[in-house]
Amino acid sequence: MQGSVTEFLKPRLVDIEQVSSTHAKVTLEPLERGFGHTLGNALRRILLSSMPGCAVTEVEIDGVLHEYSTKEGVQEDILEILLNLKGLAVRVQGKDEVILTLNKSGIGPVTAADITHDGDVEIVKPQHVICHLTDENASINMRIKVQRGRGYVPASARIHSEEDERPIGRLLVDACYSPVERIAYNVEAARVEQRTDLDKLVIEMETNGTIDPEEAIRRAATILAEQLEAFVDLRDVRQPEVKEEKPEFDPILLRPVDDLELTVRSANCLKAEAIHYIGDLVQRTEVELLKTPNLGKKSLTEIKDVLASRGLSLGMRLENWPPASIADE
């Protein structure tokens, strides 16, 4: 086996052993030493917590007001029925939420096969038992809400948000959306030519039948790869801060000198010198203004006092004056 000492091995053999329709073993080798546990643990956590699926979230049973009651002619109490409904394996196509109905009467078991649904819904395990009717005159009618989601969402997390609008008799169910029921991984020794310090990763998993084990592994690997993409190129992906553009000049400098409410004599003297804006005025010095015809010390004092009341003074330096909005006039 030739190659750089810093070059990582890539898995070349992927073996999938389909034990049953819901049980499979996936073998991946060879892996660099330590990568068996690194990849195995990451895939295991994703498969258990992040796989999307469908689950029962709400149930309404005729004649039942709360989950701590019983129903005449039914062997199980309501809590046990809800627990059995949590194990319902449903595959839904093209929808995020569906309502299923179940109506059954007479002695015998009530199974998932008794559920009425449309063509977008598939009951994967129709033999799954929901409850048992023990009386010839007994019956049970229920409406079952199935939603698409990810991970595990307890009913308590939805109680407060839905309490005001949830009618009496609508029972909330802990939703376990993950189609993966069990997963374990094992790391064994592997050998390639003269190297004996390599890993072989063996993943064994079982699903509820709504997803093929091979497809589940593929989805988990895709999720992991997408999450790691951000580390491939470590450029700052944060959105640039939008800085509020500050005006180039104080707005008061753009106002006409008439807004200073000077005496007519002072105002006319300034206009004669082409001083039309306050920004024009503050750039003049006392000496320059005293050279203005008909503008004496009294008018100068008036101008200085008015500017001072607005936080301005004579002799100020303004870069890039006048602004384009004034220069174009």
Swiss-Prot record:
Gene3D superfamilies: 5' to 3' exonuclease, C-terminal subdomain, DNA-directed RNA polymerase, insert domain, RNA polymerase, RBP11-like subunit. InterPro entries: DNA-dir_RNA_pol_insert, DNA-dir_RNA_pol_RpoA/D/Rpb3, DNA-dir_RpoA, RBP11-like, RNAP_asu_C, RNApol_insert_sf. One of its GO terms (biological process) is DNA-templated transcription. GO terms for cellular component: cytoplasm; DNA-directed RNA polymerase complex. Residues 1-235 are annotated as: Alpha N-terminal domain (alpha-NTD). It comes from the Bacteria. Its EC number is 2.7.7.6. It holds the Pfam family RNA_pol_A_bac. One of its GO terms (molecular function) is DNA binding. Residues 249-329 are annotated as: Alpha C-terminal domain (alpha-CTD). It is an enzyme of class 2 (transferase). Keywords: DNA-directed RNA polymerase, Nucleotidyltransferase, Transcription, Transferase. It catalyses: RNA(n) + a ribonucleoside 5'-triphosphate = RNA(n+1) + diphosphate. HAMAP family: RNApol_bact_RpoA (MF_00059). Belongs to the RNA polymerase alpha chain family. The N-terminal domain is essential for RNAP assembly and basal transcription, whereas the C-terminal domain is involved in interaction with transcriptional regulators and with upstream promoter elements. Homodimer. The RNAP catalytic core consists of 2 alpha, 1 beta, 1 beta' and 1 omega subunit. When a sigma factor is associated with the core the holoenzyme is formed, which can initiate transcription. DNA-dependent RNA polymerase catalyzes the transcription of DNA into RNA using the four ribonucleoside triphosphates as substrates. This is DNA-directed RNA polymerase subunit alpha. It comes from Yersinia pseudotuberculosis serotype I (strain IP32953). The gene is rpoA.
